[in-house]
Amino acid sequence: MQIAIIAAGCFWGVQEVYLRKFIPAAAILKTSVGYTGGITADPTYKEVCTNTTNHAEALKIEFDEKLTSYDKIIEFFFAMHDPTTSNQQGNDIGTQYRSAIFTTNPEQATIAKRVMNEVQAKHYPNKKIVTQILPAGKWWDAEDYHQLYLEKNPDGYRCSSHFLRWNVFE
């Protein structure tokens, strides 16, 4: 089992896209939404939304490395959101919506940088990817009502930028 931590806008949609579109689905063992990358301890959603904590809305993915790779998790990340917008995904604006990869070890950082460079060359030759690649810091799970939010609220808000831009699994 390995952990990936990513931020790509509203965490509800990021979680939903990974759970519904990632192949093989069995590779995703567990997901949780939460906050990381900020300066305050144990932040609340309300605090994060003030743009004063510097936390990102993020997704923690526990995955089976026998069924998929960190490379594939990261390529999927770049395919499912717009990594060229700073602190914004669709209509969601603020530092909590930034594009970021929070790496748990040096190997993940190397892979994330390599995949980002490959995606930049292949899919965004005329736009600069602004995704931050940072060492993972403290993680705080978001409040319970945020966990699997769109599964519990099928008509809930979905960010317009959360869709697959290319087939990662060809």
Curated annotation (Swiss-Prot):
Documented EC number(s): 1.8.4.11
A cellular component term, taken from the record's GO annotations: cytosol
Protein's organism: Schizosaccharomyces pombe (strain 972 / ATCC 24843) (Fission yeast)
Assigned protein family: Belongs to the MsrA Met sulfoxide reductase family.
Keyword terms: Cytoplasm, Nucleus, Oxidoreductase
Keyword Flavoprotein belongs to the record: no
Location, primary (coarse class): cytoplasm
Name of this chain's protein: Probable peptide methionine sulfoxide reductase
SUPFAM superfamilies: Peptide methionine sulfoxide reductase
Enzyme class: oxidoreductase
One Gene Ontology MF term: peptide-methionine (S)-S-oxide reductase activity
Reaction equations catalysed: L-methionyl-[protein] + [thioredoxin]-disulfide + H2O = L-methionyl-(S)-S-oxide-[protein] + [thioredoxin]-dithiol; [thioredoxin]-disulfide + L-methionine + H2O = L-methionine (S)-S-oxide + [thioredoxin]-dithiol
GO BP: cellular response to oxidative stress; L-methionine salvage from methionine sulphoxide; protein repair
Localization annotation: Cytoplasm; Nucleus
